[in-house]
Amino acid sequence: MTHNDSRTLQDLAVYTDCLPDARFSQLIHLFTLQHFAALQADRFPFYRTTFWYPSDRQPETLFERVIEDLRPVVRPSAEVVGVEWWFSVLNINATPQWLLPCHFDRNDLDERDVRHIVFPEWASVLFLNAVPYGELVVTDQVINNADKPTPREPGVMRFVHPSPNQYALFPGQLYHGVLGRMWRPMQPNLVRVAMAVNWGAEKPKAGYMRDSREAMAAFDLG
């Protein structure tokens, strides 16, 4: 999708208990919260470890089967040629401000000419666990010709609180991030884990992106 996409924040949808129980159980037993925490303690680069799963082949891993379970919920258009996915792993007390600053997902992080930027058709987040804060925040802001969010300040914001097996789906051109505790009392530190799934009409250009079939080895899951 280009920056001329007419969809808005009103198209954001949240689905509870989205995956079949058996599939979600498989996912959290394969990749446990303890394993996520151990990798993070070793400074594993979660945000520079992304994967591409093309639409023209059958699923071969559990992660790809999860994506196929999400497909009928998303109902991507025929323009979507694949999915970029990764795990978002954040310590909820890393900062009281934004755990992940607001940003635009795009096909090329180095491209500054807005005319050439392609956004996912749909961006989405599958939450794996519950935490007291760390909400996904999606705003009504889109990109302008100066590569900045417009309007300058959001007119409307939607907050999605993490809950196991909850799935948030929103137009891929919208500005979004992850909120810290802000004004709220500090709670015991937890790791917030979510699977980000972007449905795109173009394969992103990130040099660190891998074939989706390499995920098991990348995460040392055997």
Please name every model-derived segment.
Residues E79-E84, S88-G180, P185, N189-A196, ...:
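Catalytic core of non-heme Fe(II) oxygenases with the double-stranded beta-helix
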Residues T2-S88, N93-L100, R213:
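Non-heme Fe(II)/2-oxoglutarate
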